[in-house]
Amino acid sequence: MAFPLHSFFKRVLTGTLLLLSNYSWAQELDWLPIPYVYVAKGESLRDLLIDFSANYDATVVVSDKINDKVSGQFEHDNPQDFLQHIASLYNLVWYYDGNVLYIFKNSEVASRLIRLQESEAAELKLALQRSGIWEPRFGWRPDASNRLVYVSGPPRYLELVEQTAAALEQQTQIRSEKTGALAIEIFPLKYASASDRTIHYRDDEVAAPGVATILQRVLSDATIQQVTVDNQRIPQAATRASAQAKVEADPSLNAIIVRDSPERMPMYQRLIHALDKPSARIEVALSIVDINADQLTELGVDWRVGIRTGNNHQVVIKTTGDQSNIASNGALGSLIDARGLDYLLARVNLLENEGSAQVVSRPTLLTQENAQAVIDHHETYYVKVTGKEVAELKGITYGTMLRMTPRVLTQGDKSEISLNLHIEDGNQKPNSSGIDGIPTISRTVVDTVARVGHGQSLIIGGIYRDELSVALSKVPLLGDIPYLGALFRRKSELTRRTVRLFIIEPRIIDEGIAHHLALGNGRDLRTGILAVDEISNQSTTLNKLLGGFQCQPLNKAQEVQKWLSQNNKSSYLTQCKMDKSLGWRVVEGACTPAESWCVSAPKRGVL
């Protein structure tokens, strides 16, 4: 196709000006300055560029995204002019690294954020210029601290910049290590997790940082300035060792690997020791109970007063009641003790047998203190959402989810459990589908923080739910007759109102008395247990084995007595025979102070 001469020069001039405005100071090719002429008739632009480089005995790498068709005649005095012309016509960007010519589409130009720790942006720029990689046509923007550089350009240019930055960082680090010695220490963890833990639930996720991440944040956020005795600043070359600090987690060993100056290693040891502490094991059981509203009196519930428990305590579920009435009647708010919980569950079981109550769900979850745990039982159905031109499936999820973070609060000998609770309970309402067939989802969300004493349970109640059930009855055959069959059909609707209760039962899982007895005489019980045929209280072999293991020195036996006393249990000691000496066996039971080696349980209310 022929173009008018003035139109052709106008297009070339416009493209050249645009190229110079966007990419000034272009690096020239070091190829032979000989003319290049090419006549294309619907040929591939890729083939044209390959033929162009072959004409100068050069190597070219053409992007796969360049698939245009070319028609026309190209005549240029040198390769630089041809390359700029073809780039302006077909939106190309090129980069020459001294050996290979790389050609990409403008859409492939990307950006990178390079983080420098050992060197600065000015040093990186100087290294790029000396190596011949620097290209002023592309973006280069450092931050005020000269530690972050925002670079843009074609992919090959970005790769060379990143490789140069990595080599410069390593070289600078080696130079710094010569001026200041570094040490590497491995700190194994016993209880805490070295690496991060990710908790997934529904469409969300929560990251629980490990010890390595916590230390990295402390190092990255802290600004350390060292001064001498005469209040003079230390030169930066002497403080470079603090910038080389590196903390990594080794999941296979559950250990922390630290690289830093030797004088700072005790600080890491103290921090890691403070973070690596044993956590209490806490079990939380959640009971979701539906009770017929008409049968609340059978349960002993009065929303104006509370629940009558087995030890004559009142449990006020609706905590917005009269506080003076609560105080005068000894009410415990939404907390009940173990005896009151047994009474409540017994009444629920009775009503369940009569069809007036239902235990909807009862999940149990075991976790550690200050560690978030999630139990999620849900269902997902998908709804087709149609737009103007596209349609997609959108998932709707509902079910029972318990998310909690427990914490143990200790005051003297008393322990409480602080629960950060999130309960979500959802279900599909029956007979609630609309015209489009999408059912209605009912959700109940409870988000609270509660403190529960040892042996107590938390009740959250007063949530009413209305259920509508539709039943259709008819006379066989006659009810199916058109029009006339309506006389032989009957449709009945039944509305049932229920009250939903959430019962949360937290408890601390301790190691038990058997653990203390095993530690008392320092003997391992596991080998003997494996030889016992029957594990029961009636097993003679097991009783003989336990009797031998319970015989221990006096100081160890007294430690067990002290532990029993802290748990409100009385005990006394009896003599027994150990391997080479006399020992003492702890007997749990009531005793009088006049008896030998008697430790009575402390009286309630007496500290």
Swiss-Prot record:
Domain of life: Bacteria
Subcellular location: Cell outer membrane
UniProt keyword terms in alphabetical order: Cell outer membrane, Membrane, Plasmid, Protein transport, Signal, Translocation, Transport, Virulence
Expression induction or repression: Thermally induced and down-regulated in the presence of calcium.
Secretion signal, residue range per the UniProt entry: 1-26
GO cellular component terms, A-Z: cell outer membrane; type II protein secretion system complex; type III protein secretion system complex
Presence of the UniProt keyword Lyase in the record: no
Pfam families assigned: Secretin, Secretin_N, T3S_SPI-1_N0
Gene3D superfamilies the record matches: 3.30.1370.120, 3.55.50.30
GO BP: protein secretion; protein secretion by the type III secretion system
Function: Component of the type III secretion system (T3SS), also called injectisome, which is used to inject bacterial effector proteins into eukaryotic host cells. Forms a ring-shaped multimeric structure with an apparent central pore in the outer membrane.
SUBUNIT field: The core secretion machinery of the T3SS is composed of approximately 20 different proteins, including cytoplasmic components, a base, an export apparatus and a needle. This subunit is part of the base, which anchors the injectisome in the bacterial cell envelope. Forms a stable homooligomeric complex. Interacts with the inner membrane ring inner protein YscD/SctD.
HAMAP family: Type_III_secretin (MF_02219)
Similarity comment text for this entry: Belongs to the bacterial secretin family. T3SS SctC subfamily.
The protein's name in its UniProt record: Type 3 secretion system secretin
Source species of the chain: Yersinia pestis
